[in-house]
């Protein structure tokens, strides 16, 4: 027994710790009476308060006085795991009080036995602690342990807390899982700062019960986009609850908590908690010593003019329930060099009369400031100065109403009734004509004007005509280009010009009509520019017959144009590989090399690779992992255009045209080639029912016998496209127009490769790709193209369009690639706030990527202007020592036109250069 006791004592001495809990490890010691006696003696020594835990244990080990008898009792202890890591398990022993009990928790020293469960053996370790918060260190990762706990008292009584409860450590390099819920417990005051309050936050453990957490918080009302505040929790005793201080009254905050693995810097997603801080007057009920008063309500100003520039003002406001200390009234004349008057008013005032004030300008401002010891609040009005001639006395005003205004109103009512009756009869006649028109067969190539007649509402009236207002029957509607939820777009001819006609669907609601008119007003206000899609005309006299005529761009959207270029390059690479393989086979046959098993194997591999490349070239219908899925095999009469709508087709009468009515997929693609002018007399000899158009650029040309080989895009061509977009956006910025949705899908391209920007400030309902996310209302937002300030504060400026232009450069460089290919729209905002941006794509020069990065600056004022972008892109084009294909074609067309118009030295009859006889495209 003496030897066993010495070994027991030696191990106690060897593993004594010095932390607050004074945990002591005793390895390879059995659970026996010696251990219980030493523990009881130690606890008895601690209760006397003469020595600390280490000294008591040492004294009991040498000269200890043991209790007379050990006895087991039943007590209300509970052991709970707090957290764990790869090498630690943290748990706490709590005294559970009865529902009616009030006795305090008894003093005890805890004995903890840890059995490590292994395949071939069982290792046991013993711990002693006078603290109920226990940390078991030095454990193996991903190991299981059975824990038994005893509570030992100084009188020799002990109780069993837990027996063989199983706990496990985490695996090495674990990935922290999703956080638990984060809740707001309460707001608490800050005694040292009465102008701020604090919030107590509580969160639940993560799924793996990790021990380390990070917390970030920021104010959503911040205008300078400050960095979020971060707090790291590394003390295991301070988990799951924290107080966020220095919160400003009446502000919005976001608090996020995540769990982290500090060994390899892995972390989980943030779990966010929005916090709405109460106002100062709600926290300190109407304490104007600490809080500013409410702003004055119902501020009104009545003015009278007796002499030129001399006014009398009667200013009134609502009397508040809780009065401020005083008011200050400020009156400002906005004219240069105008006067400023200031008045200090008593707290009981609710009105003030200014008998005479000189106002030189046409506008002036009135500000009423409510002041107290806690601050001030202001209400203001900007007013137009009334003229003396329009001011009448009350008696004259009554006479004016009785003898002039009332008779005029009666006359207007009679005229309105007469007009409504005449309009109702005209509408009924139109309805009868429309029913007859719907019964006739609809022809896609030519539509009679009666086919446009639809049912009109009785309460609709004609709008004021202007130079762009067109008659619906003067527009020849042809095939459908696309359709969306808002309406559909057809190809049409108006005054010998090819146009795109945007129509509303049958029975549009008020919101559709309003959005359609807003789109027309925007296009009219922007004006004409070579790189902006222009308006040709519109018809808005009846809501069921509204149409918008815009320029027709035959090559469709820039996005599809770039993706077709990407596919063309892939096919050319496959063809080149095929030719190289065939040439290698011919060379081997020409040299008449002796065939053996090795050469046979090489030829088989080459043939297999050739067939694989051909299959991939034929079946590849997608871009790459960075692009959205889209169909390349569909051939339509016109290229897809986002501004023209998509999906199913509906005619103007509302009948459905199935997709099988489209051109067959295997027909050759339409080649755009100008045709020579023919004799007009010969043209009109054909069938009168069939109309022939001279300009083949906008119509199907299925004869592919005389087709030109496709010219691949060069780097100079891509730079030319980007520069044209910058020129168009520069024009919009100079006219104070913010696009808000600049992307390749909203840029159109003509047959001569000229660029036209479309869909600026227009409706978004025709979009079908997953690049738009719902905003707070019914609108949608293009998340991956929006600037950081647009995502966080809904701020849209020309600088935010520059950010979108940088994303457009990424699309051009990658030939239609999807921005942020591996990031979902819901995660993008967090990454942008952390400073993440897209990496340089493959094949992109450093100069181009630097231009992209300058557009993505988090500070809007640090981004380049569109004028600067235009000049930088122009310099990059000159640096290539190459001329874009568009400029070459433009130069060749100009020279050809000059030669054709010069008939002095030619004996051949020349075609007249009168362009008005041709169908002219607007692009």
Curated annotation (Swiss-Prot):
- One MF term in GO for this entry? ATP binding
Tell me the keywords, alphabetical order: ATP-binding, Developmental protein, Glycoprotein, Kinase, Magnesium, Membrane, Metal-binding, Nucleotide-binding, Phosphoprotein, Receptor, Signal, Transferase, Transmembrane, Transmembrane helix, Tyrosine-protein kinase
UniProt binding sites for ATP: 481-489, 502
Tell me the active site.
Answer: 741 (proton acceptor)
Residue ranges, annotated region (Disordered): 656-687
Q: Does the keyword Glycoprotein apply?
A: yes
Phosphoserine modification sites?
A: 608
Q: Which residues lie on this side of the membrane: Extracellular?
A: 21-399
Required cofactor(s): Mg(2+)
Q: Where does the UniProt entry place glycosylation sites?
A: 37, 63, 107, 142, 146, 287, 298, 314, 326, 342, 348, 377
Extract one GO cellular component term from the record.
Answer: receptor complex
Question: What does UniProt give as the signal peptide span?
Answer: 1-20
PTM comment: the record says: May be auto-phosphorylated on tyrosine residues.
Top-level class of the enzyme under EC nomenclature: transferase
Q: Which reaction does it catalyse?
A: L-tyrosyl-[protein] + ATP = O-phospho-L-tyrosyl-[protein] + ADP + H(+)
Output the InterPro entries linked to this UniProt entry: FN3_sf, Kinase-like_dom_sf, Prot_kinase_dom, Protein_kinase_ATP_BS, RTK, Ser-Thr/Tyr_kinase_cat_dom, Tyr_kinase_AS, Tyr_kinase_cat_dom
- On whether Protease is a keyword of this UniProt record, the answer is no
Membrane-crossing segments per the record: 400-420
| Subcellular location field | Membrane
The enzyme's E.C. designation: 2.7.10.1
Q: GO terms for biological process? A: cell surface receptor protein tyrosine kinase signaling pathway; chorion-containing eggshell pattern formation; gastrulation; germ cell migration; metamorphosis; negative phototaxis; negative regulation of hippo signaling; negative regulation of multicellular organism growth
Indicate how the chain sits in the lipid bilayer: Single-pass type I membrane protein
Record domain Protein kinase: where: 475-874
Please explain the role this protein plays, according to its UniProt record.
Probable receptor tyrosine kinase which is required for determination of anterior and posterior terminal structures in the embryo. During postembryonic development, involved in the initiation of metamorphosis probably by inducing the production of ecdysone in response to prothoracicotropic hormone Ptth. Binding to Ptth stimulates activation of canonical MAPK signaling leading to ERK phosphorylation.
Query: What does the sequence similarity comment in the record state about its family?
Result: Belongs to the protein kinase superfamily. Tyr protein kinase family.
Q: What is this protein called?
A: Tyrosine-protein kinase receptor torso
UniProt organism field:
Drosophila melanogaster
Its ancestry begins with: Eukaryota, Metazoa, Ecdysozoa, Arthropoda, Hexapoda
């Amino acid at each position: 027994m003496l030897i066993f006791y010495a070994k027991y004592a030696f191990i106690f001495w060897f593993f004594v710790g010095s932390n607050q809990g004074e945990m002591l490890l005793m390895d390879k010691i059995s659970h026996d009476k010696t251990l219980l006696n030493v523990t009881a003696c130690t606890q008895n020594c601690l209760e006397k308060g003469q020595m600390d835990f280490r000294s008591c244990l040492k004294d009991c080990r040498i000269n200890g006085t043991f209790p007379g008898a050990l006895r087991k009792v039943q007590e209300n202890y509970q052991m709970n795991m707090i957290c764990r890591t790869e090498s630690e398990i943290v748990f706490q022993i709590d005294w559970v009080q009865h529902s009616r009990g009030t006795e305090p928790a008894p003093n005890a020293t805890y004995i903890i036995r840890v059995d490590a469960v292994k395949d071939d053996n069982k290792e046991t370790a013993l711990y002693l602690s006078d603290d109920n918060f226990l940390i078991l260190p030095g454990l193996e990762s991903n190991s299981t342990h059975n824990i038994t706990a005893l509570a030992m008292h100084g009188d020799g009584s002990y109780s069993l807390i837990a027996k063989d409860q199983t706990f496990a450590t985490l695996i090495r390099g674990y990935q922290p899982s999703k956080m638990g819920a984060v809740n707001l417990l309460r707001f608490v005051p800050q005694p040292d700062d009465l102008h701020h309050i604090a919030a107590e936050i509580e969160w639940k453990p993560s799924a793996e019960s990790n021990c380390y957490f990070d917390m970030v918080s920021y104010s959503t009302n911040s205008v300078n986009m400050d960095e979020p505040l971060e707090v790291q929790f590394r003390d295991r005793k301070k988990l799951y609850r924290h107080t966020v201080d220095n919160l400003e009254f009446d502000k919005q905050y976001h608090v996020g908590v995540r769990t982290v693995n500090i060994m390899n810097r892995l972390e989980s997603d943030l779990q966010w908690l929005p916090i709405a801080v109460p106002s100062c007057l709600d926290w300190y009920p109407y304490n104007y010593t600490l809080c500013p008063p409410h702003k004055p309500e119902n501020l009104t100003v009545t003015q009278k003019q007796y002499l030129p520039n001399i006014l009398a003002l009667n200013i009134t406001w609502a009397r508040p329930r809780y009065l401020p200390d005083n008011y200050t009234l400020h009156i400002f004349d906005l004219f240069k060099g105008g006067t400023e008057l200031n008045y200090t008013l008593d707290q009981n005032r609710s009105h003030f009369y200014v008998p005479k004030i000189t106002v030189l300008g046409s506008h002036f401002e009135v500000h009423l400031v409510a002041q107290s010891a806690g601050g001030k609040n202001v209400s203001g009005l900007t007013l137009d100065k009334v003229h003396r001639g329009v001011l009448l006395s009350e008696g004259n005003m009554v006479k004016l109403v009785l003898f002039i205004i009332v008779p005029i109103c009666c006359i207007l009512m009679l005229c309105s009734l007469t007009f409504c009756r005449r309009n109702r009869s005209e509408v009924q006649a139109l309805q009868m004509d429309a029913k007859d028109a719907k019964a006739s067969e609809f022809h896609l190539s030519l539509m009679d004007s009666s086919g446009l007649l639809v049912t009109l509402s009785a309460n609709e009236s004609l709008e004021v005509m202007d130079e762009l207002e067109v008659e619906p029957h003067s527009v020849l509607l042809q095939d459908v280009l696309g359709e969306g939820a808002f309406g559909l777009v057809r190809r049409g001819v108006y005054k010998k010009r090819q146009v795109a006609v945007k129509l509303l669907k049958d029975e549009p609601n008020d919101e559709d009509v309003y959005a359609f008119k807003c789109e027309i007003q925007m296009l009219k206000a922007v004006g004409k520019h070579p790189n902006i899609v222009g308006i040709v005309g519109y018809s808005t006299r009846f809501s069921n017959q509204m149409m918008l005529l815009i320029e027709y761009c035959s090559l469709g959207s820039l996005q599809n144009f770039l993706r077709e270029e990407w596919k063309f390059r892939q096919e050319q690479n496959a063809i080149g590989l095929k030719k190289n393989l065939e040439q290698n086979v011919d060379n081997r046959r020409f040299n008449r090399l002796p065939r053996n098993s090795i050469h046979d194997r090489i030829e088989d591999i080459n043939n297999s690779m050739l067939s694989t490349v051909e299959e991939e070239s034929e079946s590849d219908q997608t871009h790459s992992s960075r692009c959205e899925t889209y169909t390349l095999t569909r051939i339509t009469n016109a290229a897809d255009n986002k501004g023209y709508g998509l999906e199913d087709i509906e005619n103007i009468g509302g009948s459905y045209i199935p997709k099988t009515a489209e051109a067959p997929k295997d027909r050759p693609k339409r080649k755009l080639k100008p045709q020579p002018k023919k004799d007009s007399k010969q043209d009109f000899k054909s069938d009168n029912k069939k109309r022939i158009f001279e300009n083949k650029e906008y119509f199907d040309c299925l004869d592919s016998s005389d087709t030109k080989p496709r010219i691949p895009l060069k780097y100079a061509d891509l730079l030319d496209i980007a520069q044209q977009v910058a020129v168009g956006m520069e024009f919009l910025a100079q006219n104070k127009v913010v696009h808000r949705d600049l992307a390749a899908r909203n840029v159109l391209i003509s047959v001569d490769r000229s660029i036209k920007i479309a869909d600026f400030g227009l409706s978004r309902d025709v979009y079908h790709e997953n690049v738009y996310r719902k905003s707070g209302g019914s609108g949608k937002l293009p998340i991956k193209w929006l600037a950081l300030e647009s995502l966080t504060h809904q701020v849209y400026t020309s600088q935010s369009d520059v950010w979108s232009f940088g994303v457009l450069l990424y699309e051009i460089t990658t030939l239609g690639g999807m921005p942020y290919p591996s990031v979902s729209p819901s995660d993008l905002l967090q990454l942008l706030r952390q400073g993440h941006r897209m990496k340089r794509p493959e094949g992109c020069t450093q100069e181009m990527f630097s231009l992209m990065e300058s557009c993505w600056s988090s500070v809007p004022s640090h981004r380049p202007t569109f004028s600067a972008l235009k000049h930088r892109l122009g310099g990059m084009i000159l640096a290539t020592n190459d001329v874009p294909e568009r400029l070459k074609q433009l130069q060749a067309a100009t020279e050809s036109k000059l030669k054709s118009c010069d008939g002095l030295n030619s004996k051949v009859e020349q075609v007249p250069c009168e362009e008005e006889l041709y169908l002219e495209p607007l692009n």
